[in-house]
Swiss-Prot record:
GO terms for molecular function: rRNA binding; structural constituent of ribosome; tRNA binding. This is Small ribosomal subunit protein uS13. It comes from Prochlorococcus marinus (strain MIT 9211). NCBIfam families: uS13_bact (TIGR03631). Located at the top of the head of the 30S subunit, it contacts several helices of the 16S rRNA. In the 70S ribosome it contacts the 23S rRNA (bridge B1a) and protein L5 of the 50S subunit (bridge B1b), connecting the 2 subunits; these bridges are implicated in subunit movement. Contacts the tRNAs in the A and P-sites. InterPro entries: Rbsml_uS13_C, Ribosomal_uS13, Ribosomal_uS13-like_H2TH, Ribosomal_uS13_bac-type, Ribosomal_uS13_CS. It comes from the Bacteria. SUPFAM superfamilies: S13-like H2TH domain. The keyword Nuclease does not apply. PROSITE patterns: RIBOSOMAL_S13_1 (PS00646), RIBOSOMAL_S13_2 (PS50159). Residues 91-121 are annotated as: Disordered. Keywords: Ribonucleoprotein, Ribosomal protein, RNA-binding, rRNA-binding, tRNA-binding. GO terms for biological process: translation. Gene3D superfamilies: 1.10.8.50, 30s ribosomal protein s13, domain 2.
Amino acid sequence: MARIAGIDIPREKRVEVALTYIYGVGLTRAKSILAKAGVNPDIRVKDLDDGDVQKLRTAVESFTLEGDLRRQEGMALKRLQDIGCLRGRRHRMSLPVRGQRTRTNARTRRGSRKTVAGRKK
């Protein structure tokens, strides 16, 4: 396995797909990394030589990925919560943030239903 950005990427997959195992790298970014490094996207990871792997490492270093990206996203959410804006409050209450309805639906975000005892007649 080639190790890029602290992640062991799978040997049997095409390089283009294998790069998406890195947090913060999707298919589009993987294609741009391969173009920047000058590596053919159709070859398998096991067929890469050391020079190609080194080129990929240097190309990947120019992006914010993995732990740094997770930390950056967490700090952005914490900032929203600290300033007390609506988005931050919705995140804190585990409710949908982008204006979706919550009277019905939003079950994934709100969690499982809380059982309410039925009234006796």
